[in-house]
Amino acid sequence: VAVYHEGYLYAYSSRFLTCVDMATGKAMWKSRQPGDGFLILVDGHLVILTKEGSLHVAEANPSGYQEVARLDLFSDLSWTHPSFADGSIFVRSMGELARVDVRAGAVIPTAEAEAEEAPAEGVFQAFLNDVKAATHKKEVVDRFMAAQSEFPVIEGENLVHFLYRGEAGDMAIGGDMIGARQEESMTRIEGTDLFYYSTELQSDARVSYLFFRDYKDELLDPLNSKTARSTMWGADMELQVRGTEKQLSWLAMPHWKHPSHLDPPPDGLPRGRVETHELRSDIFGLTHSIAVYIPAGYDTSVDRYPTIYLHAGSDALERGEWTNSLDNLIQRTVEPLIVVFIDIGVGDIFIPRDDYGEVWAKEIVPFIDSTYRTNPVADARANAGSGDGAYDALYCAFKYPELSSRIAIQSLHMGDFGRERIEPLVQTADEHPLKIYMEWGIYDMRSPQEGWDMRENSRNLADWLLGRGYDVVAREVPDGTGWPSWKNRNDAVLQSLFPIGWND
């Protein structure tokens, strides 16, 4: 809700506090401080409670954000406007209430008074000290940048410094290591055009990220040539479901290992092929596509093959490099198999969950079994998926237990409502034996300021399924979200479902 004071509106635009001239409609300023939150106007001052639980008082001034006081109040999420009455500010978090009395002349620390957290002692901190002491700062920056063999700059096994050099009034960074719908400010080195953001990651981590310039421009890291494609991140680092593709920069820490199964198969290695089919669905009255991977040797064999139904399959084919993984792993660590890439409900087509499951069970599975030499038993069928495709896989597996008894899911996107739909379908391992592989990233999709965390949802579901006796392998991996992450473990998914000799 906006507030008005002396010809100007003050409000949040996305996550940024903004001042707008009512006469011209021009934005006078934007500020990342004090963080996303809720504001009221009291006696010419903005009183703001942030979602992280801090209380701020700033002048309502069109020249810029000028904080006069702050107080860290709550450790849990706050999601309501402050109130003011009888000289006191009243605020609440999800679990607590507080009254803050306003007193003239009270000394309350401001953001500017707090010491800025510096990077840990090391090469980069020494560089910062050198720049601070130098008369000719540009020369010190030039030498440091020229001495680097790669960017971002990694110190030791865990410390990483993201750098941006160029003209900007404000720079920020967003990505897997930070979470959805938020960025972290980058610090300008005074007297230079170099900005930095320092953090610690696991020594074998891989994360995707973007830079944000002057609140509007999304930038790849111009110093880092590693890029990836993802449909998980929308504008302003919003979570999106199979949305528009976005290019991201990515970083690997020193102990991360490139998955060789993603490489193009070597010359001479037998390769499978992908066939496409257009299926008319009588259940929802539309035509949809499926793609089917057929392993090398299928045409000269009389064998029947296990089948994986990969939900949200078009993304897996386009960005998940599944065909490379299949060609490289089959007959080595993975049994020869058929993979069906399902593409229902992509784009603007919304398919109710019950209809989706029915299409899979009553139309797709019978079509595949009648078209290809599948092994048509539950133990030879698997559901798999990543992100929202993981929820589709989970739903189909538990809704139709007679059709499949294996499942592999990555980064399950399932909130409380989704879990309420799944839990009534779940029986026990005695009633419905099911082999389950689950994984999620340490830096997976989450929004701390909105109180949701897909990592925690996955942990809770894994524990719940284990409690009901299911065979669950659950892994938390040092990676982020989207296909830049998931594809790195195509091998783990395949080997969890149908390893060589699975049916011996």
Residue ranges: model-predicted function:
Residues 1-111:
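Noncatalytic, solvent-exposed loop/strand surfaces
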Residues 115-182, 189-504:
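Non-catalytic cap/lid and distal C-terminal segments of serine-dependent acyl enzymes
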Residues 27, 69, 98, 171, ...:
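Short beta-strand segments
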